[in-house]
Amino acid sequence: MGLKIVDGSIVHDNLTSSSPPSVTNSSPLLNTKRRNSITSLSDYKKNKDTLNNSNNNINQPFENSNNFNNNSKEIKNENKIKNFFQHLFSILLLKNPTMIQIIETLELSTNIYNIQFKLKYLLAICVSSQIIFKSSGLLITLLVLYLGTFFNKISINNKDKNKNNNTIDYSLKNNNIDTSLIKDINNSVISNNSSNSNNNNINNSNNNNNNNNRILSPNQLSKSSNVEYNKCKCKSPTTSSNNYLSSSQSRVQTLSSPNISPCNICVSPNLLYNSLSSLSSSLPINSCNYSMSEQEGDEFESNFDFEDSQYEESDEEDNSSPAFHLYSSPNLRVACNKISTFSPNGRKLGTN
């Protein structure tokens, strides 16, 4: 296999041997062709190189643009991935209520041994103890934290008890002050009431003394005290001591007088008045032959004249009865034998 130069170009020749072509210098035309072919080959190589370089120069901006496009695509893909993860993270943390609650709880704080700790710091302590000391360290830290919270509860309860005791003491003091004021007021009221009662007692005693010092007639005594009458035997002054009045011939006496006995003793009008009015002073008791002088009788009658005049109008009906004349007769104070001549209804029974 050999090479031939035909028209300035190299052509393979299968018929010829592989020996290098021989160039003869037999003719001048061949020499010129040979020279042209050599020059054309060198020019061809140069032109080819220049064309390749020019093509490379032309293709470089395209390659640069392609590289830029590839780089921009890679950047866009990375940004898309970042945006996706950011969006997903924002959805998980900000829009999920459970995540929001978790974040808020991590920001909370608790008192442990009277010191405030945030939960995120406590969580970091637990995680670090787990990493360093493993499970035993985690259990010890949790136990210490629990004891700290228990200590805080005890201290808070003690503070509450002290506050309650202080409030109770304050309320008791106020109640004692109120009770003392009430006692003072009650004592003042009691003293005022006692003074008023004493004044009323004094006034009542004075009125009673005035009423007791007032002299009432036998008619007034009998009407004011609603006296009932009872029969009593009386001794006659003219007859002997053994001669007594019969049961029908009796005198009217009052049951209210404690000094009157059912024996042969007559009572003076002054003693009857004093016994009915419950006075302490008493007059001497005389027997039935009690007599009064004319001056004493006049004075005694003058004492009753004024008071008897006040009851004249009210006593008009009673004056008509014989018993009234019997009881109000002045002869009753002179002798007892004249009383026996009348019964309680005014009927004349006869004389001894």
Curated annotation (Swiss-Prot):
Cellular component GO terms held in the UniProt record: membrane
Domain of life: Eukaryota
UniProt keyword Glycoprotein present: yes
Subcellular location(s) per record: Membrane
Bias type Low complexity, positions: 50-72, 193-213
Main location: membrane
Membrane topology classification: Single-pass membrane protein
Residues with attached carbohydrate: 14, 52, 70, 165, 186, 192-193, 203, 289
Keyword vocabulary terms for this entry: Glycoprotein, Membrane, Transmembrane, Transmembrane helix
Region spans: Disordered: 41-73, 193-219
Chain ranges passing through the membrane: 131-151
Entry protein name: Putative uncharacterized protein DDB_G0274369
Species for this entry: Dictyostelium discoideum
